[in-house]
Amino acid sequence: AVLLGTEWTTTADRPDELRLRLDSYPMVADIAARYGDMDANGHLNNLALEALHENARGTMNRSLFPDIYDVATRRLRLVTSQNAVHFLAEAHWPAVIRTGAGVGRIGRTSFVASTGLFIDGRCIGVCDTVLVLLGDDGPVPLSDEVRAALQTVLLGPARGL
C-alpha cells in the first residue's frame, strides 16, 4: 500500500506576523548578497539565503558566547537538531540584506535561534533552528548562565528600530 496522507511528514506553520517585522529582532546586521548567490533565473538561490540565516545565527551565538566556535577554549558545544526555513519572497542581486536574529524559545537542553531576512523593509524569509547543548554523553541542561544570556535576545514586540 502506498501512503498518500501526511501522517509521516513534519512541516512548519506559516510564520507569525511579528516574525515579518524587523523590529521584533534584538540583533540586526547588514550583509551584501554575492554575485555567486544567484541561480540561473537571476534570483538569490535558496541555499544562499539559508547560508545568510546561518551566518546571522552564528553571529548571534558568537556575540553571546565569544569562544563558542573556538574548539580549544569553548565551554559550549551546540549542534543543530532541526531547521525550518520559510522562503517568502524572491530576492535579486545586487542587494543589501538586513538580517534579524534572536531567540524564539528556550527549552531544557536546547533553544530556538530565530532569524529573518529583509530587503527594503520587506521580509523575504524566516528560519527557526533548534540548537541542542551537548556534553560527552548527549544533550545536557542549559546552565542558568546560558539561560540568562539567551534571555537578553528573546524575540519581542516592536523595538523601534
Q: What do the predicted segments below correspond to?
A:
Residues A1-S24, A29, F87, A91-V96, ...:
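HotDog/MaoC-like acyl-thioester-processing domains
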Residues W8-S63:
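Catalytic strand-loop segment that frames the active site of acyl-thioester-processing enzymes
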Residues L44, L78-T80, I124:
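A broad, structural micro-motif
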Residues N61, T73, A158-L161:
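Hydrophobic, proline/glycine-rich low-complexity stretches
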Residues S63-Y69:
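Short, surface-exposed acidic-centric catalytic microdomains
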Residues R74-E90:
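Small beta-barrel nucleic-acid-binding modules, principally OB-folds
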Residues S81, A95-R98:
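Short Pro/Gly-enriched beta-strand edge/turn motifs at strand-loop
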